[in-house]
Swiss-Prot record:
Residues 7-28 have a biased composition (Basic residues). It comes from Prochlorococcus marinus (strain MIT 9303). Coiled coil: none annotated. The lineage of its organism: Bacteria, Bacillati, Cyanobacteriota, Cyanophyceae, Synechococcales. DNA-dependent RNA polymerase catalyzes the transcription of DNA into RNA using the four ribonucleoside triphosphates as substrates. This is DNA-directed RNA polymerase subunit beta'.
Length: 1374
């Protein structure tokens, strides 16, 4: 497979070899290569008989690439592909249903799981575990069964049918994976519901056997969730990538070596370094135990060297890292190490920031695809250790353990320190030693005798720390009865911010519900039986009565269906001098009220409807106040209105008077001006066509309003027009005009006979006065109120009618209209003088008592009482029986009883009343029936007492276990009476919904269990977790961190609840940390703690952690060192956390990518005190910049600035970048640009983004300016031939900077050279002379600059370069 033709065995066709080797080195290499190649060609091909799966294929391709370069690898991969397809075709590999073979072990595994789950349910029934623990155990049981089934599937295929198509496909990694094959031939497994909670009913079948209907529905849940998640996560992942690119886009390799002596320490993990050292440079000598130097400083570590370190048992290596690189605003080649694309030092100008961002962001999309193939939960990543010998357990003197309850409800112990546990055999043999790590769970105790193959310990995994979230689960009652607390629970009342009181359990314990028949009592029902009294079936237990609130006349509606409504008329009012008349129109019924004198009121409601306070009952139908057209309103002195205007009804008249009306006709047109048929200011007669199809109704002067050639309005003002030359008169009436009384002189020869409104008008005939008629309307002081008859109960609500006059318009208002308007409305308004806002009044039509033909309007207020109907026994209310105590038409007084309801007993038993709570009436009562108790007669003497609670299996007498759960009610001789019950376990901090002694119905909530669940270790949580880390989010309830190192002392508060952890520091200072309830303390008395160590469990706040590190170091070190060290500690932590999330998903990302991002997040500090520098307090500045400023201050003797390091999330870091163009293109564009403008910022265009936006060459790769400068410096000064050349050799712009040539000073008249098309041979010669790789496309690969500025002679440009080019035919003379 690996034999290739001798021709393709050139040592390497790699394009980018470093020139930084010295001359002697390169000559030696050439010699070696020359000697190696003939031998290489003669090596016979080696054949290896081995299965090549995905992993082996990866290694093969990597080896080929490394030893033979790209071209050979590509052709080899092609040959392999052809080989594979050819044999697959010949073997006819395809998949049929027959290939899906279900392992025989499946049935046994399912039976075992069922048995385990039955046992778990039994534990829950006996109150040994909580609902949450039951759920967790069920889910873990199924998950474990699933895993074992996968193993069975693998084993089945491997042993019985290794060439099965499905197995080959999944096993080779060609397509699909085991989790999918498992669903085809194992079981589909657990599914999650749309809320993301796992349904504890798994899908036991697989797709080969077929799903039941229920399973199919559940399966679709999971599948849908997978699809939706994928869609959402793709978007999330893309956004994460965008933010990462934004924060790191200006990180470019700009220097060869920054010269730093700092580095980071990489420690051995799982017995080796793996690939974590490969591609890095050592920051210090690496010396083995014997003092032999294995690697000097700045040595590139390749895989063989890494292996050598491992062999020499080296535990940690200090390597250079982007985190500690001191290059300004970039990283240097030595700190960055290899560019992983071609496993060599990164080139200058390589945009490593963007590569890092894409490397971290890209797996996000992949990871999301793995959401639900695995069916929800990942198994616990913990190692269980079983005993290998039978014997005695010894913990040893170092051990420190504390009690712990596992998620499955098992009692265990958790180790607080690392120690070694020994199992000493009872007979002969070697003792078993087990290393216990902190946090491991021990299922045995010190000195315990155990058998072989017993679970001893569950070792805590140091894998990814999954983030936890608080979740709740309800405990629902399965039977009706009375609640009893166990003493252990110790409920306490907790007040929240709103002042609501909740009851919480403090300790783990049980709530009991003792069986009985519970009756819910209706409101205002009172028990009529005493406690502990025997009651018979059908006996009245409680009675409720319903009374009238106000009293009045009773109306009984005919019992329509089950509605039992009793109405009582409490207040009524009849309008006795109005007849009620109704008429039918096509738009519905119209009702009128007619008075004796003939005035009519329009009714605004209809009989049978309801109206509320302040609503209009009727309106006077009166045409006296109706105008012919629109016009202008003027109030004569004396007429007064209320200021406020109600939206619909206009202004209420306070005092009557005269209203003056000046009519004017307004046509609103909104048509083109060309349709106008008259002129502005023209006098027209009534009936004139003013615009096509629109006629004037009155005679008068026309005013035309137009805008942008659109005709808006035409106003016709009627009256008589008089030309006038008297200036004084014209001025007097110009503008708003004036009202002139009869007999007054208006101007010379113009007198008013009636009241007129005079205005000065300019018309085509000339200026004059327009005398407009004024109409007068007299408004009375008060409206007429009809006579009413009242009937009212003493306590009942009041009813009244108020007559009001309302004006539609205020003084000076102009009404634009052609039709007339109603100026005054007289309305009858309902008034109820009652406190209840929701009270409504019924409108009724009644016959007059004397004249039966006449109908009158009556308004009534009804009190409606709903009477309960009889129910035959229902489960919670018992049987009820209701009796009415009144008849139709009867008159009742306030608080008279209308109906009584009795609650009847369903089964005989002993009635009991609950203990009433303060202020709470009795809402329920319980009858303890014969079937709720059981009497057991024991053989021996009883071992139990009255009041004791027992569960199945507890001893009643010697060797006589109880067969049920309950409370002992009495013991007489050997007869024990038990009241049946059911225990429910509640965990600490659960919210209790019931109090001791309360009565509950089946289905009531007893408690709300609060628990922490791990956010599933699925990347569904992985992406948000990475986002949380990179955005440096502050967790809601973070862990308490130790601020200064010292010794721990734990103090209990007086109330036995609050805990305070005190840390006695080195200088005997005491740090106090109060611990909130419900928090687990992670330290023990006398333990030594460091700064930043966790005192309680919970997520860590990274900002707080940085402060802890910095504050601690600041006391012992100079400011700069403290900041650098604190940042380094945090950086290490962040890199590890991000790596853990990806590793848990099996995604490998090189550390350096994460380091580049983390470096950007931690590069800034906040100035606290500026000292004598020009910095501002609160400003965010690069650490390097502050360092330089403070060094300058040290030289000049000024006060340096004080600062604290800050951690910025990626979004914040992007917005705080030096380049405002880049920040503005990311988010909050306006804010960023305005701030930059106000501060007068400059953008130095250092990054890629800002250059792309402005349209310049990006400073990476070939556009990297530093690169060009360096080459120019090597080549010596050259004039730019293109800059001074007007003829323009544009094609020479494609040449690289190291391609510039010396121009000899030519005489003025001399001819200039012009580029000719070179022949292939010429090009070859030129390329070889300038060191250009022929494999690269047109001059695309260029020589890498050297490190030590050593150049081989043949690389230097020839002083007579121009002549050389001419001789080669590249330049011709014209």
């Amino acid at each position: 497979m690996t034999s290739t033709s001798p021709k393709s065995r050139k040592p390497s066709t790699k394009t980018t070899k470093s020139k930084s080797k010295s001359k002697s080195k390169s000559k030696a290499a050439k010699a070696a290569a020359a000697s190696a190649s003939p031998a290489l060609a003669r090596t016979p091909p080696q054949f290896r008989n081995r299965v090549v799966d995905k992993k082996a294929l990866k290694q093969l391709v990597a080896w080929a690439y490394k030893t033979h370069g790209t071209a050979v690898t590509a052709s080899m991969a092609d040959n392999l592909k052809d080989l594979g397809f050819r044999y697959a075709t010949q073997a006819a590999v395809s998949i049929s249903v027959e290939d899906l073979k279900v392992p025989e072990a499946k049935q046994d595994l399912l039976c075992q799981a069922e048995a385990q789950i039955t046992a778990t349910e039994e534990c829950y029934r006996l109150g040994e575990i909580t609902e949450v623990e039951r759920h967790t155990k069920v889910i873990d049981t199924w998950t474990e069964t699933n895993e074992r089934l996968v193993d069975a599937v693998k084993k089945n295929f491997n042993q019985n049918d290794p060439l099965n198509s499905v197995w080959m496909m999944a096993n080779s990694g060609a397509r699909g994976n085991m989790s999918q094959v498992r669903q085809l031939v194992g079981m589909r497994g657990l599914m999650a519901n749309p809320q993301g909670e796992i349904i504890d009913l798994p899908i036991r079948t697989n797709f080969r056997e077929g799903l039941t209907v229920t399973e199919y529905v559940i399966s679709s849940y999971g599948a849908r969730k997978g699809l939706v998640d994928t869609a959402l996560r793709t978007a999330d992942s893309g956004y994460l990538t965008r933010r990462l690119v934004d924060v790191a886009q200006d990180v470019i390799v700009r220097e060869d070596d920054c010269g730093t002596t700092r580095g980071i320490i990489v420690k051995v993990e799982d017995g080796g370094f793996g690939s974590r050292l490969v591609g890095r440079l050592t920051a210090d000598q690496v010396v083995n135990v014997d003092g032999e130097i294995l690697a000097e400083r700045n040595t590139e570590i390749d895989p063989p060297l890494s292996k050598r370190f491992e062999k020499a048992a080296i535990t940690e290596v200090m390597v250079r890292s982007p985190l500690t690189c001191e290059a300004n605003r970039s990283v240097c080649r030595k700190c960055y190490g290899w560019a992983l694309a071609h496993n060599e030092l990164a080139d200058l100008g390589e945009a490593v920031g963007i590569i890092a961002a894409q490397s971290i962001g890209e797996p996000g999309t992949q990871l999301t695809m793995r959401t639900f193939h695995t069916g929800g939960v990942s198994t616990a990543e913990t190692g269980v250790v079983r005993s290998t010998v039978a014997g005695t357990v010894e913990f040893g003197p170092k051990a420190r353990v504390r009690g712990y309850r596992t998620p499955h409800g098992l009692e265990a112990q958790q180790s607080e320190v690392d120690f070694t546990l020994t199992v000493k055999p009872s007979g002969k043999g070697r003792a078993q030693r087990i290393d216990i790590t902190t946090g491991s769970l021990l299922f045995v105790s010190d000195g315990q005798e155990i058998e072989a193959d017993v679970t001893v310990v569950q070792i805590a995994s140091v894998a990814v720390k999954k983030s936890v979230e608080k979740a709740t689960k309800d405990v629902i009652c399965d039977l009706a009865g009375q609640v009893r607390y166990e003493q252990v629970i110790q409920p306490r009342e907790v007040k929240d911010r709103q002042g609501n009181i909740t009851l919480k359990a403090q300790r783990l314990g049980r709530l009991w519900v003792l069986a009985g028949d519970v009756y819910n009592l209706p409101p205002n029902a009172e028990p009529v039986v005493q406690g502990n009294v025997k009651v018979e079936r059908g006996q009245v237990l409680a009675e409720a009565s319903q009374a009238s609130e106000f009293g009045g006349e009773v109306r009984l509606r005919d019992s329509i269906g089950d509605s039992r409504e009793v109405q009582i008329v409490t207040t009524s009012m009849t309008m006795k001098d109005f007849k009620l008349l109704g008429e039918s129109t096509h738009s519905g019924e119209l009702w009128h009220l007619e008075a004796k004198e003939g005035t009519r009121y329009r009714l605004n409601t209809i009989p049978g409807s309801k109206i509320g306070n302040g609503e209009v009952v009727a309106e006077l139908a009166d045409d006296r106040f109706r105008t012919q057209t629109g016009g202008l309103v003027r109030f004569a002195p004396g007429l007064a209105i209320k200021k406020a205007r109600s939206a619909k009804n206009g202004f209420e008249v306070n005092k009557g008077g005269t209203l003056l009306w000046i009519p004017q006709e307004t046509h609103e047109i909104n048509k083109d001006i060309s349709l106008l048929m008259i002129e502005d200011g023209q006098w027209i007669e009534a009936g004139t066509e003013v615009v096509k199809d629109i006629f004037s109704q009155t005679a008068g002067i026309v005013t035309v309003t137009q805008k942008n050639d659109i005709l808006r309005e035409i106003i016709v003002r009627s009256g008589s027009f008089h030309l006038c030359a008297e200036t004084k008169a014209l001025e007097r009436f110009r503008g708003d005009g004036q009202i002139v009384n009869p007999g007054e002189t208006i101007a010379k020869g113009i007198n008013s006979e009636a009241m007129v409104f005079v205005q000065t008008e300019d018309t085509p005939e000339g200026t004059g006065l327009l005398l407009r008629p004024v109409e007068e309307y007299t408004i009375p002081n008060e409206a007429h109120l009809p006579e009413l008859t009242h009937v009212k109960q003493p306590k009942g609500p009041h009813l009244g009618i108020k007559a009001t006059q309302r004006l539609a318009f205020k003084d000076g208002e102009l009404i634009k209209s052609v039709e007339g308007v109603e100026l005054l409305k007289t309305q009858l308004i309902l008034e109820t003088f009652d406190t209840t806002p929701q009270m409504t009044v019924d409108v009724e039509a009644v016959r007059d008592k004397r004249a039966k033909t006449i109908e009158r309007l009556r308004l009534v207020i009804l009190e409606s009482i709903l009477v309960r109907r009889d129910t035959i026994s229902d489960s919670s209310h018992g049987s009820t029986h209701t009796e009415l105590q009144i008849e139709d038409g009867q008159s009742v007084k306030a608080s008279d009883v209308v109906a009584t309801t009795q609650i009847l007993c369903k089964q005989e038993g002993i009635a009991q009343l609950p203990v009433p709570q303060e202020g709470d009436p009795v809402r329920r009562l319980i009858v303890e029936r014969d079937e709720d108790t059981i009497t057991v007669t024991t053989k021996g003497s009883p071992l139990v007492g009255v009041g004791q609670r027992l569960v199945d299996g507890d001893s009643l007498a010697k060797d006589e276990p109880s067969s049920c759960c309950g409370e002992v009610e009495e013991v007489e001789g050997k007869a024990i009476t038990l009241r049946l019950g059911r225990p429910y376990m509640v965990s600490p901090d659960s919210v209790l919904h019931v109090r001791d002694g309360d009565l509950v119905q089946r289905g009531d909530g007893l408690a709300l269990l609060v628990f922490e669940r791990q956010k599933t270790g699925d990347i569904v949580q992985g992406l948000p977790r990475i986002e949380e880390l990179l955005e440096a989010r502050r967790p809601r309830e973070s862990a308490v961190l130790c601020k200064k190192p010292g010794t721990v002392e734990i103090k209990q508060g007086e109330d036995d609840e609050s805990i305070t952890v005190t840390v006695i520091e080195a200088d005997d200072a005491i740090g106090e940390y109060p611990i909130l309830l419900g928090r687990n303390v992670m330290v023990s008395n006398g333990q030594q703690v460091h700064a930043g160590e966790l005192l309680t469990d919970g997520p860590i706040n990274p900002h707080e952690l940085l402060d802890c590190f910095f504050e601690d170091l600041r006391g012992r070190k100079p400011l700069m060192d403290a900041a650098q060290e604190a940042i380094a500690k945090l950086q290490h932590r962040l890199v590890t956390e991000v790596q853990n999330v990806y590793k848990s998903q099996g995604v490998s990302i090189d550390d350096k990518h994460i380091e580049v991002i983390v470096r950007q997040m931690t590069s800034k500090v906040r100035i606290e005190d500026a000292g004598d520098t020009t910095l501002l307090p609160g400003e965010l500045i690069e650490l390097r910049q502050v360092e330089d400023t403070n060094q300058a201050m040290a030289i000049t003797g000024g006060a340096p600035s004080e600062f604290t390091p800050v951690l910025l999330g990626i979004t914040k870091a992007s917005l705080n970048t030096d380049s405002f163009i880049s920040a503005a293109s990311f988010q909050e564009t306006t804010r960023v640009l305005t701030e930059a403008a106000i501060e007068g910022k400059s953008d130095w265009l250092r990054g890629l983004k800002e250059n792309v936006i402005i349209g310049r060459l990006i400073p990476a790769g070939t556009g990297f300016s530093g690169f060009q400068e360096e080459l120019r410096a090597e080549a010596g000064p050259h004039p730019d031939i293109l800059a001074e050349d007007p003829a323009g050799y544009r094609r020479m712009q494609n040449l690289r900077p190291d391609y510039t040539v010396d121009m000899p000073a030519a005489p003025a008249a001399s001819s200039t050279a012009v580029l000719a098309d070179p022949s292939a041979a010429d090009l070859e010669a030129t390329r070889s002379r300038h060191g250009i790789d022929p494999a690269a496309s047109n001059f695309a690969a260029f020589v890498r600059p050297t490190g030590e500025n050593e150049l081989e002679e043949e690389q230097l440009p020839d002083p007579s370069a121009l002549e050389g080019l001419q001789q080669e035919g590249l330049l011709t003379e014209e």
